[in-house]
């Protein structure tokens, strides 16, 4: 970043801060404004070491809740505005990663056109959007943010500052009086709508544009013209992921698929309207094909003003038909009483594409390639990418639930021999029975049995309803609308076969069943489970019919919670090594999906780096990665940033597939070092979470319970009503630690692991061990990514604040003991990182991030201080609505400021 750009960021933040201050003074009075300013000055003193965090706490100790709420809102809004400035700054700096640079690298390193084309033709790259409890901002807030961002752009380009500041004042006045978050717990429908918001903001335009750019890059770099392709096709979990979420049902799945279909159909109508206006070609000056003329004649548009404009007439008819698609998707109450359309809706995207191709061929046959390559090409690419379904909605449920459903269905069909219950069978017996059923063409139950009321328990009825709704979605919107059924906590072969039986029962044999390995033990056993699965001729033939492709998902969140940061990262990498080798041995293509969260403790970090950090052979052109929460907002909230992130995604996949991205001199030694480090780190992590006082410390020193109580997201915080860490969902686990600025899931245990690894040899040999670690950091993308992501999350931690959160624990002995463990390990890890990397600070390698953290730090402190004070009040019995609501404001403010907090 140049000094000029850095200065501009600083000036933009000051401008927005000044206008926000003016709004607060006007709306809430000078006293509140001065309170906010006094808080800000004290926070700066704390950040510069001129005051202690306790001094900041004093401001709020006896402050009434109304004023406390206003201060919390002020700093939360400022975090939101600071994000706008930094996002705008990011757009002005050339991206480190781009398709252009990647294709140049492929050419430079000797990749052939044939190899590149082979990977691209079979590639499937998918960002999969998922819900997140702190991403509940309303459309009004997003729209206001967008307008303020545009005003900043106007200021950068010489706009009238008086006019700009006045509109900023207007927009911020509206923003200040608009609730950032909903009062009620968001429904699944709310979360589905939030996910679709990003399609309207960026993805509808940018994903097809990216797919066209890949074709263009192939032509420009390798001289090879590829047909219309969709390397990237987005996915979603919102409305189909019912693992631990009792609110997902047939209705929400139907809502998700229909809203997605409506979104893309409306987009096509809008784009066809623009195309109709643009294709003003008159047959007095241009010619058209006979098939185009036939399309025009069939359009029903016989307006005298258009008698010489066959292209417009043709598009008019297409738009009328697509409008019928939209009408058919509207709810009955919205179309009741309206005159039904005379136009027949398009039955399939292929039918729609055929009409678009008629226009394309006609234009190109008459020297109008330049016209064909504009909006028409964009629409054709969108149809190739999105079809009529927009995104692929995944079904996800845990293996235990699938087994319970199978038990009831088999009991109803009397399919278990000897009068036994299915759950009483040995694993081998289960597998034999399941395969028998999968090979039997007849259904398990009589037609309509799945829809009979009270035929099954409420849980099983709901689960079967989801499968029936999925089958209806496929009939309505095509096979890509529901393409994956993911089994959480996969531990056996029967876990994979059980949902296959349910899918067969509802006619969804083509849906891919995807085992999700997520605990440390399951990751270690993943390859063995698949080896056993493939040993069954039925399943091997099943794979052969699918092109010998096996999709597997790896879970970053639960593995981290299970074994700690370093052990989880190595378990994932080692699992991939085993899967790659197994697939090579059996001549099967491996397609990996990665269940990553926004936070480093849930597998977060730069997507490009994460993809390149995979073992050789683990990508092969295809990769699916979940995206969520604040990360979605940061990546896809604007077209410019969306394009950057999408290009980085695809660039990583292409480079990992076609280049040697793992140049380790001695892989066996590198893997042995990682096994040692992972083992040592896991032991240290277990010492922490196994401490008798750990549960008390965790639940009382973080806002865990408040996350569950304060309407943050539609999903419950835990899978079961227990205090076990294993039953806690990963998002509240990571979010709780990030709120207390401890961030344990992103670093704990690494320092002890490095210390034990180095000290395991005589003192004279220890420098050579340090050098081994330095060499790995310099040459191995995986190790470098693990260490860099760790440094990022440590830089966002603040251990002095964690001490204040520890004071919330009832038992001071437990508080002191656990905090001392955490503080000691943090310092040990910090020193280890600096020694390995040679850096002077945790963020030395990323000066942009260093400046960002420095700017944000004084605005994070007040939010933590307010949260600490209000947690004391809330837990002490102060159940005023404004107390709980202000805690929620601080949570969202901190998550907004930290950006990848959960």
From Swiss-Prot:
Enzyme class: lyase
Molecular function via GO: magnesium ion binding; phosphoenolpyruvate carboxylase activity
Claim: S-adenosyl-L-methionine is one of the keywords in the record: no
GO CC terms: cytosol
Active site: 132, 561
Assigned keywords, A-Z: Carbon dioxide fixation, Lyase, Magnesium
InterPro entries assigned: PEP_COase, PEP_COase_bac/pln-type, PEP_COase_Lys_AS, PEPCASE_His_AS, Pyrv/PenolPyrv_kinase-like_dom
Required co-factors: Mg(2+)
Source organism, top-level taxon: Bacteria
UniProt GO BP: carbon fixation; oxaloacetate metabolic process; tricarboxylic acid cycle
Catalytic activity: oxaloacetate + phosphate = phosphoenolpyruvate + hydrogencarbonate
Record PANTHER family: PHOSPHOENOLPYRUVATE CARBOXYLASE (PTHR30523:SF6)
The family this protein is said to belong to: Belongs to the PEPCase type 1 family.
Record function comment: Forms oxaloacetate, a four-carbon dicarboxylic acid source for the tricarboxylic acid cycle.
Region (Disordered): 327-346
SUPFAM superfamilies (alphabetical): Phosphoenolpyruvate/pyruvate domain
One Pfam family it belongs to: PEPcase
Protein name per Swiss-Prot or TrEMBL: Phosphoenolpyruvate carboxylase
Keyword Lyase among UniProt keywords: yes
The EC number(s) this enzyme carries: 4.1.1.31
């Amino acid at each position: 970043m140049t000094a000029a750009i850095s200065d501009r960021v600083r000036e933009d933040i000051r401008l927005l801060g000044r206008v926000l201050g003016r709004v607060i003074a006007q709306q809430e009075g000078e006293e509140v404004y001065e309170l906010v300013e006094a808080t800000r000055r004290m926070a700066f003193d704390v950040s510069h070491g001129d005051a202690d965090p306790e001094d900041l706490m004093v401001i709020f100790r006896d402050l009434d809740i109304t004023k406390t709420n206003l201060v919390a809102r002020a700093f939360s809004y400022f975090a939101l505005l600071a994000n706008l400035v930094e996002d705008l700054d990011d757009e002005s700096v050339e991206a480190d990663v781009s398709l252009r640079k990647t294709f140049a690298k492929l050419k430079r390193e000797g990749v052939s056109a044939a190899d590149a084309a082979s990977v691209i033709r079979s590639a499937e790259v998918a960002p999969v959007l998922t819900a997140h409890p702190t991403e509940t901002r309303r459309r009004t807030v997003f729209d206001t943010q967008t307008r303020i961002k545009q005003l900043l752009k106007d200021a950068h380009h010489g706009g009238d500052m008086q006019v700009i500041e006045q509109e900023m004042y207007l927009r911020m006045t509206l923003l200040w009086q608009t609730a950032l978050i909903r009062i009620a717990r968001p429904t699944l429908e709310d979360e589905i709508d939030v996910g679709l918001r990003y399609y309207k903001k960026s993805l509808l335009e940018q994903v097809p544009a990216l797919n066209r750019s890949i074709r263009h890059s192939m032509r420009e770099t390798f001289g090879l013209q590829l047909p219309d392709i969709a390397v990237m096709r987005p996915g979603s979990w919102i409305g189909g992921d019912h693992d631990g979420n009792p609110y997902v049902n047939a209705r929400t799945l139907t809502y998700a698929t229909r809203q997605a279909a409506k979104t893309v159909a409306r987009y096509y109508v809008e784009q066809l309207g623009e195309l109709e206006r643009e294709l003003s070609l008159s047959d007095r000056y241009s010619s058209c094909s006979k098939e185009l003329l036939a399309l025009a004649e069939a359009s029903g548009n016989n307006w005298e003003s258009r008698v010489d404009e066959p292209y417009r007439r043709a598009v008019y008819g297409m738009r009328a038909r697509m409008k019928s698609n939209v009408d058919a998707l509207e709810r009955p109450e919205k179309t009741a009483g309206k005159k039904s359309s005379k136009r027949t809706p398009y039955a399939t995207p292929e039918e729609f594409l055929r009409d678009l191709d008629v226009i394309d061929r006609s234009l190109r046959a008459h020297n109008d390639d330049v016209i064909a390559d504009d909006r028409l090409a964009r629409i054709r690419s969108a149809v190739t990418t999105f079809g009529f379904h927009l995104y692929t909605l995944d079904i996800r449920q845990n293996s235990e639930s699938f087994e319970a459903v199978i038990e009831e269905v088999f009991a109803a069909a009397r399919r278990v021999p000897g009068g036994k219950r299915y759950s009483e069978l040995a694993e081998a017996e289960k597998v034999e029975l399941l395969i028998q059923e999968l090979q039997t063409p007849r259904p398990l139950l009589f037609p309509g049995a799945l829809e009979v009321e009270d035929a099954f328990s409420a849980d099983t009825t709901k689960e079967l309803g989801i499968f029936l709704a999925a089958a209806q979605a496929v009939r309505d919107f095509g096979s890509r609308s529901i393409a994956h059924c993911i089994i959480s906590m996969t531990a056996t072969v029967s876990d994979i076969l059980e949902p296959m039986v349910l899918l067969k029962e509802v006619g969804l044999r083509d849906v891919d069943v995807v085992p999700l390995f997520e605990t440390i033990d399951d990751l270690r056993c993943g390859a063995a489970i698949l080896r056993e699965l493939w040993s069954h001729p039925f399943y091997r033939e099943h794979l052969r019919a699918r092109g010998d492709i096996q999709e597997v998902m790896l879970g970053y969140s639960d593995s981290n919670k299970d074994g700690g940061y370093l052990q989880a990262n190595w378990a994932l990498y080692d699992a991939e090594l085993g899967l790659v080798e197994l697939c090579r041995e059996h001549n099967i293509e491996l397609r990996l999906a990665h269940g990553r969260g926004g936070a480093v403790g849930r597998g977060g970090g730069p997507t490009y780096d994460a993809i390149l950090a995979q073992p050789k052979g683990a990508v092969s052109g295809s990769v699916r990665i979940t995206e969520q929460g604040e990360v979605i907002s940061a990546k896809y909230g604007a077209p410019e940033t969306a394009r950057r992130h999408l290009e980085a995604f695809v660039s990583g996949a292409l480079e990992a597939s076609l280049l040697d991205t793992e140049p380790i001199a001695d892989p066996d030694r590198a893997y042995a070092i990682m096994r040692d480090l992972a083992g040592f780190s896991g032991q240290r992590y277990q010492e922490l979470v196994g401490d008798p006082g750990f549960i008390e410390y965790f639940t009382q020193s973080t806002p865990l319970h408040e996350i569950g109580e304060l309407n943050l997201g539609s999903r419950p915080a835990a899978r079961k009503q227990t205090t076990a860490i294993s039953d806690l969902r990963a998002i509240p686990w990571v979010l709780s630690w990030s709120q207390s600025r401890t961030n344990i899931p992103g670093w704990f245990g690494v320092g002890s692991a490095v210390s034990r690894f180095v000290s395991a040899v005589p003192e004279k040999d220890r420098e050579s061990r340090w050098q081994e670690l330095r060499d790995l950091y310099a040459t191995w993308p995986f190790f470098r990514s693990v260490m860099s992501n760790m440094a990022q999350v440590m830089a966002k931690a603040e251990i002095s604040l964690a001490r204040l959160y520890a004071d919330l624990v009832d038992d001071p002995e437990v508080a002191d003991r656990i905090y001392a463990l955490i503080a000691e390990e943090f310092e040990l890890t910090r020193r280890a990182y600096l020694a390995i990397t040679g850096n002077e600070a945790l963020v030395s390698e990323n000066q942009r991030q260093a400046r960002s953290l420095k700017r944000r730090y004084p605005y994070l402190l007040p939010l933590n201080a307010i949260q600490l004070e209000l947690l004391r009040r809330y837990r002490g019995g102060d159940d005023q609505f404004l107390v709980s609501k202000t805690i929620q404001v601080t949570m969202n403010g901190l998550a907004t400021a930290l950006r990848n907090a959960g």
